[in-house]
Amino acid sequence: MKNLAQAVAISLIALIAISCKSTKETASSCTNVESSVKWTPQTEPQILASIERTACYGRCPMYKTTFMDNGEVTYVGKGFVDKIGTYKTLISEEDVQFIKSNIIEYDYFDLDSLYPTPITDFPSSITEVNLNGKRKKVINRRTPPTNLKDFEKFLDSILKGKELQKVSDETNYDTKAK
């Protein structure tokens, strides 16, 4: 009986020792794996700039172009434009940098947020910019300063000569094309 008790005690001690060693090795190997894998956060592309031309009582072009900081561009033509629907293209890194430098050159962040008009028939040009953590939206109804008019013309000119791929017939600016 004494031998049986000793055998059980030795077996129990051996099992405990083996299980402790196994746990230590597992914990240590997990730590090594975690320390060898470097996590790099993935960021979603951010809107860099956009321009929207709104309706009037006549035949005013209605569209919105959105430029992302990774070069993706989405154009949504709504009415009185050659391309109706949602289109996409890519612009070069140089074009993205040119947009950024023009935001600064045209003093976009110094503009007023609204250039109003009491006349209801006038279309609006709505520009938005997001640069270095600063965001600004400007609604131009009629009497903007020269630098805002020039910035709007600049944004409109970027897609000239670019090949746009139609991705849907959707004309809602707030819906992301798939």
Q: Which sequence ranges carry the predicted segments?
A:
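A short-motif feature that recognizes glycine-rich, charge-decorated loops
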Residues: Y75-D110
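An acidic/histidine-cluster motif and surrounding catalytic segment
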Residues: C60
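A mature extracytoplasmic/lumenal domain signature
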Residues: G71, G79, I103, L131-G133, ...
